[in-house]
């Protein structure tokens, strides 16, 4: 073998270690992406959110570094690096703008969840409940099981009475708030079990948070401007 060449055994060993390292990283990433849901594991969900939040500044930093390294060396790479940096920065700014607009409507830190741009909100036993949803659904179902209230499958409260089911729920987006009015329910008061169904009734520039200080009827609590 000529001088300066790398032994084949050493190359194979490096490839084996590199492959093993990436195998661990990708396996962890697969578990986090598949089970990183708030209903399954709060810890994995937190890790998943941290990864998503880190990606924006990391990609922006890599794009700027590539632009610096390619300057006066490869103008094509330099142009693409600047383009990717601009796209990443624009997406990052749009995320914060929409998240802040959504927070103004809901006053919930779920507004900064990068997975969704819609939050379902309602008031249960005097407590505001806010849940991230993938989008504004056609209808919303609240389920009551022996006094335990489930909103879109999320357990949000216990000891709830049938009479305490809300008359409306809202789904807030960055640009609008959709009000869902209750159109039907089927409940068993003795066992505290049943369901209530809500459909869209109106939308507009409303706050999704009920105003506890105002003297308003249940049907008027939501429609006050942000």
Curated annotation (Swiss-Prot):
Residues 1-11, 63-75 are virion surface. It comes from the Viruses. Residues 33-41, 97-226 are intravirion. Keywords: Glycoprotein, Host Golgi apparatus, Host membrane, Membrane, Transmembrane, Transmembrane helix, Viral envelope protein, Viral matrix protein, Virion. Pfam families: CoV_M. GO terms for molecular function: structural constituent of virion. Belongs to the alphacoronaviruses M protein family. Component of the viral envelope that plays a central role in virus morphogenesis and assembly via its interactions with other viral proteins. This is Membrane protein. It comes from Porcine epidemic diarrhea virus (strain Br1/87). The gene is M.
């Amino acid at each position: 073998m000529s001088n300066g060449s790398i032994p084949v055994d050493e190359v194979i060993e490096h490839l084996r270690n590199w492959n093993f390292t990436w195998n661990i990283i990708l396996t962890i990433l697969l578990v986090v992406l598949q089970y990183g849901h708030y209903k399954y594991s709060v810890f994995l969900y937190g890790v998943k959110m941290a990864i998503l939040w880190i990606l924006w500044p990391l990609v922006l930093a890599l794009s700027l570094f590539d632009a610096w390294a390619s300057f006066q060396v490869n103008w094509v790479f330099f142009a693409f690096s600047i383009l990717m940096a601009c796209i990443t920065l624009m997406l990052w700014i749009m995320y914060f703008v929409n998240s802040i607009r959504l927070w103004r409507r809901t006053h919930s830190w779920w507004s900064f969840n990068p997975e969704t741009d819609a939050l379902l909100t309602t008031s249960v036993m005097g407590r505001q409940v806010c849940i991230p949803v993938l989008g504004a659904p056609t209808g919303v179902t609240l389920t009551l099981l022996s006094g335990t209230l489930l909103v879109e499958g999320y357990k949000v409260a216990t000891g709830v009475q049938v009479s305490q089911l809300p008359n409306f729920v809202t789904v807030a987006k960055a640009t609008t708030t959709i009000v869902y009015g209750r159109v039907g329910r089927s409940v068993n008061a003795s066992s505290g079990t049943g369901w209530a169904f809500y459909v869209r009734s109106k939308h507009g520039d409303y706050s999704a948070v009920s105003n506890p200080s105002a003297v308003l009827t249940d049907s008027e609590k939501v429609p006050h401007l942000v």
